[in-house]
């Protein structure tokens, strides 16, 4: 399935490369956003950049199990899914990680994350910045089969820390059997 909105080709304009460099330098801050889970076998918490990389590879590994089209091919555009997963947590640069099990305050957190995504993608020249923001919004809204698949992949890793209790979410007292695992806005 062809991507209906491919990444736009950009002419090299004065300042465009500088804008892209500023964007990439801003993205480096994602490495400093600590999440609430720890990598297997490590005492430290993972960061959002590591998370995005891991779920992009998980999506590539799982795409063969996604729904098929009439011709037997995957109905999911993997490139689009990977692009969504690489940008889905960009707003956390400004807002920090929000644990999906937090009850209440979702509207405020989502608004702050959107404002952050608009700021960060706004560092890029158009139409590229708008393209990345559109992918981010598509993921947030679950507005396509690709976005729903990407959201499922993102949430699939949430069960992993339960396999390593007490290192996982134990300090936050979250257990599989208390109904917390499925909480969140989506």
Regions found by a protein language model. Give the residues of each.
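Alpha-helical, largely C-terminal catalytic domains
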Residues: 1-186
């Amino acid at each position: 399935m062809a991507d209906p909105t491919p990444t736009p080709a950009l002419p090299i304009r004065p300042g465009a490369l500088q804008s892209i460099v500023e964007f990439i330098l801003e993205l480096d801050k994602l490495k400093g956003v600590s999440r609430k889970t720890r990598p297997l076998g490590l005492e430290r918490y993972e960061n959002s950049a590591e998370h995005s990389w891991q779920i992009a590879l998980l999506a590539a590994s799982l795409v063969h199990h996604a729904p098929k089209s009439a011709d037997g091919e995957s109905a999911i555009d993997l490139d689009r899914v990977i692009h969504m997963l690489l940008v889905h947590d960009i707003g956390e640069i400004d807002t920090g990680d929000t644990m999906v099990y937090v009850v209440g305050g979702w509207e405020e957190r989502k608004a702050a994350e959107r404002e952050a995504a608009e700021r960060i993608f706004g560092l890029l020249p158009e139409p590229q910045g708008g393209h990345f923001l559109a992918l981010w919004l598509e993921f947030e809204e679950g507005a396509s089969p690709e976005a729903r698949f990407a959201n499922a992949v993102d949430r699939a890793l949430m069960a992993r820390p339960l396999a390593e209790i007490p290192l996982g979410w134990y300090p936050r007292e979250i257990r599989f059997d208390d109904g917390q695992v499925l909480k969140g806005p989506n």
